[in-house]
Each structure stands twice: as C-alpha cells, then as structure tokens.
C-alpha cells in the first residue's frame, strides 16, 4: 500500500525556487532515504509532507489524503533535525505532554510512554530534567516523542546527527525492527552514505532536484559503481548536463 506520494512538487519563496518537480513514493513497511548535502532541499520536502508548508505546484498525499489535512496529524510521527524538547521538564514530563496532544486514555498514554522509553533505552534517565541530558539522550527522547502516538508514518530529519556510532547503530536497528515487525513507513533524511545503504529505496537530491531513485543495490548496478558516493556524483553530473542542454 502506498503511504506517501509526492507528485511533481515544486516550491518557491518569492522569486527564489527551492524545489523542481520532485516525485517519489513510499510503501507500507519501507524505509526511504532522502539523500543529499545540506541545502539540497531535503528539509523543505519534509515540511511539505508534514503540512507545515504548501507546495507552489504539485501535490503531496499521505494515506490517500492530500496534505495539509488536520486528520493526518495523528498518523505522522516527526523527529526534527533540532530537538524540540522542553529543557526544564523531565523526559517523562515531555512524553506526557506530547501524548496529551492525542486522543488517548490515561491508560493508553502510560502504555505508550512505557513502550517508547524502553524502546530508546532511557529508563534510567526518564525522571531527570532534559537540560541534564547529553546530545545523544536528547535524540533518543526526540525519537520516543515521534513514536508516542504509534503513527504508521515516521519522518526523521537527520535522526543520528551528533550522536556516537554505538547509539547510531542501535537507532538503525530499531528503525529496521519498526519497519519489519510493525510495518511502519519511515522517511529518513541523511547525507551519510553508510546510513543510506540501510534504506530500502533512495531519493537522491541535488540543488532541489531529484537526480535518481532506486534501491542502493539497483543504483550501484545501474551506474556501474561500487558505492553510493559514486552514484551521487555520477547521477548529479548527468542531471547537470541534461539541465544545461535543456
């Protein structure tokens, strides 16, 4: 089942165009990576999927509903690039606050909080103020917040930036488990190519344009190279040449 469909989306701010005809889909139980350097348009795409902004052209559909749509808010879990947490509250109080935004009974809230705290391994720190957390602990709490309402679609903007390799590995193990066991659809932005290898499908973006899409292995086969950095460079070069001709 198609959970997300981005259909020929362009975005401009005044005369400054950010995105050109971006198109891709994500199926249920799939991790899709948006791959590209800083400033390529990844976060703008995320905002359009979330309904935080409108496309200048094209449409975004989540679960067969056009975005923005208030009824979709409970269906999307979002982890921003910078942690949107209340520093003076404890981890537990943060989770209770975010859980209260969704129509859950007290019992459901407690069940979900216990589940996500265990999931991100924060049991020993959950009653401490977030201001005392390390960067990695804050990222883990942000992931817990994104999962609190048990959404079918997870959108994670650079989820492992600034955390140690061991924690990064554990987060990716958890994302893979969520995909396989709970059939979550997960959209991840990253510029780290070894993380890109863990995705089912990749959407490579350069200067606001999709330069190529496909599974990591298919892309390496299609471009006859051994790693994704080479795919990006080769696809980017071909796209640039095509733009110059047209």
Question: Could you describe each region identified by the protein language model?
Answer:
Residues 58-74:
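Conserved ABC transporter NBD signature motif
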Residues 154-158:
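Catalytic Walker B motif of ABC-type/P-loop ATPase nucleotide-binding domains
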């Amino acid at each position: 089942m198609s959970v997300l469909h981005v259909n020929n989306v362009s975005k401009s701010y005044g005369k400054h165009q950010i995105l050109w005809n971006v198109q891709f889909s994500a199926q249920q139980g799939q991790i899709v990576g948006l791959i590209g350097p800083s400033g390529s348009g990844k976060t703008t795409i995320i905002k359009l999927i979330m309904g935080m902004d409108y496309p200048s052209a094209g449409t975004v559909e989540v679960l067969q509903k056009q975005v923005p749509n208030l009824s979709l808010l409970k269906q999307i879990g979002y982890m921003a690039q910078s942690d949107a947490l209340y520093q003076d509250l404890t981890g537990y109080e943060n989770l209770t606050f975010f859980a209260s935004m969704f129509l859950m009974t007290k019992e459901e809230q407690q069940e979900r909080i216990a589940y996500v705290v265990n999931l991100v391994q924060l049991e020993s720190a959950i009653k401490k103020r977030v201001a005392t957390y390390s960067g990695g602990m804050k990222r883990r709490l942000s992931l817990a917040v994104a999962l609190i309402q048990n959404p079918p679609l997870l959108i994670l903007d650079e989820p492992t930036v600034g955390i140690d390799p061991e924690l990064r590995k554990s987060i990716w193990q958890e994302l893979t488990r969520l995909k396989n066991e709970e059939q979550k659809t997960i959209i991840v932005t990253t510029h780290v190519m070894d993380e890109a290898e863990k995705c089912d499908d990749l959407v490579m973006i350069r200067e606001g344009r999709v330069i190529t899409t496909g599974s990591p292995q298919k892309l390496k086969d299609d471009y006859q190279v051994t790693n994704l950095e080479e795919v990006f460079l080769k696809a980017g070069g071909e796209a640039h040449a095509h733009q110059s001709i047209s």
